[in-house]
Amino acid sequence: MARAIMFQGTASHVGKSVLTLALARVLYLDGFKVAPFKAQNMALNSYVTLDGGEMGRAQVAQAEACGLEPRVEMNPVLLKPSSDKGSQVIVLGKPIGHYSAKSYHLERRSMVWEAVKKAYETLAQEFDFIVIEGAGSPAEVNLKASDIANMKTAFLANAPVILVADIDRGGALASLVGTMELLEPEERKMVCGFILNKFRGDLELLKPALTFLEEKTGIPVLGVMPYIPELLIPEEDSVSLEETVSNREKDLKIGVVWYPRISNFTDFEIFQYEPDVELIYIKTLQDFRDDFDLVILPGSKNTVADLNYLKQRGLDQKLYAYVEKGKPLIGICGGLQILGEKILDPDLVEGKETEVKALGILDTVTEFRGDKITRRTSTRVTRADGYFFLQREEISGYEIHHGRTFLSGERSDVLDNTENPLVFARGRVLGTYLHGLFDNDFFRHRLLNRLRREKGLDGIENRPTSLKNLRQENYDKIARVFRENVNLKKIYEILGI
């Protein structure tokens, strides 16, 4: 059976995912068979495995850092919020329905926990070590009875817990001490150390606080991790989008329309590595700049709600004016559906309306169906689109959607010959169900260089290639920083190495 160790946090977004990845990568580079695990994840940013299962993106990155193909056992439960009060529940890669928080815990808690135990035991039989990531905070007293992602998992795996706090946001010492106070006595015994994450400044000035923390709690500080800029780690929720967007002036400005249920924003991850691209998220009318070279409508977990959000804020009028100028617009998955004439929902898969008028920029109609398509796929473009350089070439990506979209008029074209079309175009407007479109190097390179030439700029020939290789380089960087700033000898002692 594998030995385990777990990272829990004083709050969401303190860096549990990155530290889990870092230790997993270190163990992998040191020659051990290691796998990541997170019992339950809540995220809109998901991934499709080779066998068509859906799982959280953070565990995908952690699996890659371990040299593994991602498997749903690494994240057996995924909650994808579809409203402020409800989520689609994914268990071992497959959706089992939409539930409110209350109904989920009342109706599905025991079944879900059995799936978690089975998934963990499967991994524990195959690997030397399991590095586990918790969720949120283990000290949410109102949620503790139903919390399966933190201490319950730690007890299942007999995993010592490293408690992580984000010192960049302030209040880190209070949050560590407060979290320890709110844990039950047997839970406190599981905590083997603290890590202060995202530190900027003079470490000497921090040392008195570390001494105080150790004396106050009796728990050792295992390390102080510095703030690492421009991490290429997939974000799981839109809270952290602003931290990943460049604020530096660059030649090309790409606007990404933001809405409350934005999903799969890893579609734009590669742009972080393009030397001439500035990504700007469009939340308000004021954010919609006149000098955008390209605008993207991303995926959505609730297309109708996000369509209404755009209309209520007048962003639909901005999009009409933008397209009228002949400027390029790309919609991905939910973005494609929003660009069409209307959305049909006869079985009320997404909401309470059976028919909704969309933006009408593409001549398409989307119908939501109960069965969900989740698969990796590729399609060959069978006719040239005239602008986006798709000329009988194969593009690949993955699909996650309930909708089926078809042509409804003559102004738009289907560019591929699949049974359920994946790529639609009308002039300089492109819509597709393919997540990962921009990871196709040839497509991204040609598009960006075309945008440059339209501004009178020379193209760039040596652009980044292979997002996979870029990620691996990034994982090595994170592991190196972890080795330099964390007491790895002590952690290895805890693991019995």
UniProtKB/Swiss-Prot annotation:
The active site is at residues 333, 435. Pathway: Cofactor biosynthesis; adenosylcobalamin biosynthesis. GO terms for molecular function: ABC-type vitamin B12 transporter activity; catalytic activity. GO terms for biological process: cobalamin biosynthetic process. The keyword ATP-binding does not apply. NCBIfam families: cobQ (TIGR00313), PRK00784.1 (NF001989). This is Cobyric acid synthase. The lineage of its organism: Bacteria, Bacillati, Bacillota, Clostridia, Thermoanaerobacterales.
